[in-house]
Regions:
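Extended ligand-binding groove/face enriched in aromatic
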Residues: 38-182, 186-190, 267-273, 277, ...
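Extended alpha-helical scaffolding segments
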Residues: 24-31, 39, 48, 250-289
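Well-ordered alpha-helical segments within folded domains of soluble proteins
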Residues: 19-32, 110-124, 154-169, 205-217, ...
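Carbohydrate-binding/catalytic loop surfaces
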Residues: 2-17, 65-105, 197-212, 252-259, ...
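Low-complexity, Ser/Thr/Pro/Gly-enriched N-terminal "stalk/linker" regions
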Residues: 1-23, 32, 42, 48, ...
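Positions within ordered alpha-helical repeat solenoids
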Residues: 32-35, 53-57, 124-127, 186, ...
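Long, repeat-rich segments with strong aromatic
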Residues: 167-266
């Protein structure tokens, strides 16, 4: 579990060294494939302890974040080229309607993603963090301000940040559950059933954004607002045959069927077709998709 790699070749230098994200990913795969239960208690505990060993305290990061040193060093390697790009972005951001992410923002989002994934995966196998994670954004007024600052015309990224707050709320005794549920009321689109403010440019973005927000609502134990509308939208906008698009699409339909039987027969057929599409992406020689 310490040397889990997602591919046999094609990895970057950093990709060959990172540990936390891939170990967490490996644990999730073990759980999904039923292999987790085949491990003995000592093996399970060792894996959980390994993931929890990444809980660290760094400046500019929330207390007890999950931090892979390789990821930390990558984002904090201040090369001349990197500093120049950041300076240019900051300058361009002065112009109205431009909002380029500087490296520090990208770094914090990366750590947030790894922290959320670690906490969520541990919860999935009935385990928890060794130390309580304390997000920077915990007060209601700060959380509302943060959510308002996100670009909701790109719900696949903003939705990911929303979902992470839902995870943190759940593990901290539902501390901001009502605020997050109320905020989803502001995002939902009555026509598509998805969640955004300004309409994204492509259907795949609308479906992917729905996947992110629906995963957050699942953590909150909250209902999907318009599951029938979302099912109709997905049926009208089938994805291209790419891994992430298919998985996002299937997840959205699956979650909707948990709440309604609307067009259930048609959706179940889509699931069967999607399995065949996913099989086409499998490379036998690489033993992966």
């Amino acid at each position: 579990f310490k040397s889990f790699l997602p591919a046999q070749e094609g990895l970057t230098t950093e990709g060959q060294k990172i540990s936390l994200g891939l170990s967490t990913y490996g644990l999730k795969l073990y759980y999904m494939l039923g292999e987790w239960e085949n491990l003995n208690n000592e093996q399970k505990n060792e894996w959980v302890e390994y993931i929890n060993s990444f809980q660290k305290n760094y400046k500019k990061l929330p207390k007890n974040s999950y931090v892979d040193k390789v990821v930390y060093d990558f984002y904090n390697n201040n090369t001349f080229r990197g500093l120049s790009k950041d300076y240019l972005k900051k300058t361009l951001n002065i112009i109205p309607n431009l909002n380029y992410e500087i490296k520090d923002t990208q770094f914090k989002k990366a750590i947030n993603a790894e922290t959320k994934q670690a906490i969520a995966t541990l919860d999935q196998v009935g385990r928890s963090s060794e130390k309580l994670f304390l997000p920077d954004i915990s007060r209601s007024e700060d959380m509302k301000k943060y959510l308002d600052s996100l670009n909701w015309s790109k719900p696949w990224t903003s939705g990911a940040q929303y979902a992470s707050l839902c995870v943190y709320s759940k593990v901290n005794e539902d501390s901001n559950k009502q605020l997050l549920v109320d905020y989803s009321n502001l995002l939902v689109n009555e026509e598509t059933g998805s969640y955004y403010k300004e309409t994204p440019n492509h259907p795949r973005e609308i479906i992917n954004g729905a996947m992110k927000v629906l995963s957050g609502l699942d953590w909150l134990g909250a209902d999907i607002h318009y599951p029938e509308k979302l099912i109709d939208y997905c049926i009208r906008n089938k994805p291209v045959t790419e891994g992430c698009d298919i998985v996002d699409y299937v997840y959205v339909l699956y979650r909707c069927l948990q709440q309604t039987d609307f067009k259930k027969k048609e959706v179940l057929q889509i699931f069967d077709d999607s399995i065949n599409d996913i099989r086409k992406l499998y490379y036998t020689n690489l033993k992966g998709f």
